[in-house]
Amino acid sequence: MSAKRTKDAGRDDKLIASFQVDHTRIGYGIFVSRRDRVGGAFVTTFDVRMKRPNAEPAIHPNAMHTIEHVVATYLRNSRFRDHVVYWGPMGCLTGFYFLTSTEREIGPREIEPLIRAAFRHLANYRGPVPGATPVNCGNYLLHDLPTAKFEAKAFLAKKWSFDYPPARRAKAGARTVFDA
């Protein structure tokens, strides 16, 4: 991706890679957002996209919070638990980031069975939301299990993609402009 820049209050910052993805063309699925080497490990940030950005309603914050709790608990108790770094919501409320640490590079198709299993677990979940107490959670009343289960079922029913659509580039004089 290009080193597109933004200017704000005298700063000249490079636009981060995830903002250079064409969000008007992202579908449902699991995408590699970035890969980093940390020590001897490959830390991969996966974009688990449940909604089409700017094309359908975002997930309600209460449901996002519940999805975060139930899926994070599932992942951290799965056979993959030693490789889970983080599971958390995107600010745009269209999906989640899943960070893994592995000895070799892994891709979306390798974690697809785990993500599908986590969402099936959520879709069928009964009982209290894990960690939804005043002691364990900073906003324990901000939960909605029925809507979280609905969103899990809807996501599982979608056809998933595994490659980001490339950002469209256009030349404007000496500049390259991205539509994302």
Label every model-predicted segment.
Residues F150-F178:
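Long, charge-rich alpha-helical interaction segments
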Residues P53-R109:
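M16/MPP (pitrilysin/insulinase) zinc-metallopeptidase core fold and M16-derived inactive scaffolds
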Residues R25-G27, Y86, N136, K171:
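Intrinsically disordered, low-complexity segments enriched in small/polar residues
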Residues M1-L75:
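His/Glu-rich zincin catalytic helix
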Residues G88-S161:
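Active-site-adjacent, His/Asp/Glu-enriched structural segments that form or flank metal-binding
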Residues S2-K7, A174-A180:
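Long, compositionally biased intrinsically disordered regions
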Residues Y74, T133-P134, R175-F178:
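A domain-level signal for the structural core that forms small-molecule/cofactor-binding pockets
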